[in-house]
């Protein structure tokens, strides 16, 4: 029988921006304290029925992925602090766009996919035990395939693009 892959073997890293006079760079911090990070592919379909056929045909013509998230707020976590700043500042456009890297930890070489997302604030403060935030990340560009490495036991990572 083949081995099942645990959810904890697919890690998410969020690009926290550092602004300088000349450019914005990102440090990719591990997304900790998240109760949920789930992707909906949201396929775009083209359906039609031809007059000479008794059935409808459907083709998938694109995708609009959305990543839903929820996290318990931890003080001093750079990912939480950045997302909370987007929520509280009701940021829009480029000010609310961040790169995210998904890293597959199951192999020797850590394959990774990097993509830009708009951070969409949805709710905060639910529950009585922990202060929580929830929202979604909506796609802002193509997938970039590569590998990830880390020098600090996967608290942060570095992404290297590979040619497909």
PLM ranges: what are they?
Residues 4, 52-115, 144-153:
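Extracellular/virion structural assembly segments
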Residues 32, 101-146:
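Short beta-strand and beta-hairpin "edge-sheet" elements
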Residues 86-92, 119-123, 137-138, 155-159:
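Short, low-complexity, polar/charged sequence segments that are solvent-exposed and flexible
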């Amino acid at each position: 029988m083949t081995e099942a892959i645990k959810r904890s073997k697919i890690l998410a890293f969020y690009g926290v921006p550092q602004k300088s006079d000349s450019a914005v760079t990102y440090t990719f911090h591990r997304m900790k304290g998240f109760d949920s990070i789930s992707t909906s592919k949201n396929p775009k379909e083209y359906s039609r029925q031809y007059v000479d056929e008794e059935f409808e045909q459907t083709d998938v013509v694109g995708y609009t992925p959305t990543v839903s998230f929820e996290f318990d707020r931890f003080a001093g976590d750079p990912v939480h602090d950045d997302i909370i700043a987007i929520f509280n500042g009701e940021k829009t456009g480029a000010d609310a766009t961040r790169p995210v890297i998904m890293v597959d930890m199951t192999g020797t070489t850590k394959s990774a996919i990097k993509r830009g997302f708009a951070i969409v604030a949805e709710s905060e403060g639910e529950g009585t035990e922990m202060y929580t935030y929830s929202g979604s990340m909506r796609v802002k560009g193509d997938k970039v395939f590569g590998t990830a490495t880390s020098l600090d036991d996967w608290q942060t990572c570095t992404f290297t693009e590979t040619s497909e």
